[in-house]
Swiss-Prot record:
Coiled-coil segments: none
Record-level GO BP terms: cellular response to heat; innate immune response; response to bacterium; response to heat; response to UV
Protein biosynthesis keyword on record: no
InterPro entries in the record: Turandot
Cellular localisation: Secreted
GO cellular component term of the entry, any: extracellular space
Transmembrane segments: none
Keywords attached to this entry: Immunity, Innate immunity, Secreted, Signal
Annotated signal peptide: 1-21
Protein's UniProt name: Protein Turandot B2
Organism: Drosophila erecta (Fruit fly)
Family to which this protein belongs: Belongs to the Turandot family.
Keyword Signal recorded: yes
Length: 129
């Protein structure tokens, strides 16, 4: 009885990581969501407000990317984000855009919308191959 329980626990440990992966359905849903965000973000404010959602999609997509794809997008994102620190340690939310939640000048809006458009096109490119 004890060995059967141990074997069952071991089997669950081996199988559980397979169930938590980024599935093809998740990838397809994120692909549709990126396309929808890009299509529906017509003005500067909607683009700026959608940046965090694009970053969240990238965070979900991250484990399934090649090291080269990760490095390319990470370098781009790191140039335009601040790491949020709480007591010198990254918060659970991680990085936030420099633009979100601020009153923006026209020059900053231009940079933020450019970031949105570039990040959106990079993510869309990952989904289309």
């Amino acid at each position: 009885m004890n060995s059967a329980t141990s074997l069952m626990c071991f089997a669950l440990l081996l199988i559980s990581p397979l169930c938590m992966g980024y599935t093809a359905e998740d990838r397809e849903a994120d692909s549709r969501r990126v396309a929808e965000i890009i299509k529906n973000s017509q003005d500067d404010n909607s683009k700026i407000n959608s940046i965090q959602e694009l970053l969240d999609i990238y965070k979900r997509l991250y484990p399934s990317l090649t090291p080269e794809e990760r490095e390319s997008i990470d370098n781009f994102v790191n140039e335009h984000t601040d790491e949020v620190l709480v007591d010198g340690v990254p918060s659970q939310g991680g990085r936030k855009t420099k633009f979100a939640g601020k009153i923006l000048s026209e020059a900053t809006k231009g940079v933020a919308t450019g970031f949105f458009e570039e990040l959106g096109s990079k993510l869309a490119g990952l989904f289309t191959g």
